[in-house]
Amino acid sequence: MAKKKAFIPFFYFTSIVFLPWVISLCCNKSLKIWITNWWNTRQCETFLNDIKEKSVLEKFIQLENLFQLDEMIKEYPETDLQQFRLGIHKETIQFIKIHNEYHIHTILHFSTNLISFVILSGYSFWGKEKLFILNSWVQEFLYNLSDTIKAFSILLLTDLCIGFHSPHGWELMIGYIYKDFGFAHYEQILSGLVSTFPVILDTIFKYWIFRYLNRVSPSLVVIYHAIND
C-alpha cells in the first residue's frame, strides 16, 4: 500500500512532463483543419488586420514595380511578355499562399499553447496534494546533500543561466519559444531580451543568496564564494 502511494506522485510528475507534448500533438491535428477553413472562408477578415500590413504592402509594391518593368519592355517579343506575366501571376499566388500559411501557423500555435496552459493549470490545481508530496521529496533530497555539493550545483546552474556563455543559450531558448508560438523572428526584440533577461536573473539570484541562504545555511554561502573565487 505504501509503495502504491509513493508511486502515485511519481506517475503524476511523469504525466506533467509528457502532457504538454500530448496536448500539442492532439490540438495541432484537431485545430489545424478548423483554423484553415476559418481563415480561408474569410471569417477572420477583421482579425489580425494590422499584423504584417507593412510587409504585405511592401511585397505588393515590389509586384507593382515588376508590372512597371513589364511596360518598359514591351518591345520584347509577345511570347516573352506572356511568360513574364505568367511568372508574375505565379509569384503573386505563391505570396498569398505564404501569407495565409503564416497567419494560420501563428493562430494554430498560439491557440495550442493557450489550451495547454489552461489544461496544465487545471491539472496542477486538482493535483495539489501530489505536488506537495513531490515538493517534500525534493526538499528532503536537497537537505541530505552536503554543503559542498549544494554549492557546486548552485555554481553550475548559475554559470549555465547567467554565465559568460549563457547569452547564446538564451538566444536559442527564446528563439525556440518565438517559433513555438508561431511568431516571426525579430532580431531587435531577441537581442533586447538576451541582453536584459540574464541580468535580471543575476540580480534576483544575488538577492536570494543574501536574504535566504545567509539565514538558512551561512556555511553554504561561504563554500559557494570560495568555489566561485
Curated annotation (Swiss-Prot):
Q: Which is a GO BP term held by this UniProt record? A: potassium ion transport
Q: What are its GO cellular component terms?
A: chloroplast inner membrane
Q: Could you identify this protein by its name?
A: Potassium/proton antiporter CemA
Organism classification, top ranks? Eukaryota, Viridiplantae, Streptophyta, Embryophyta, Tracheophyta
Family statement:
Belongs to the CemA family.
One molecular function GO term is: antiporter activity
Indicate the transmembrane segments per the record: 6-26, 107-127, 189-209
Tell me the domain of life: Eukaryota
Report the leader peptide range.
none
- The source organism is Draba nemorosa (Woodland whitlowgrass)
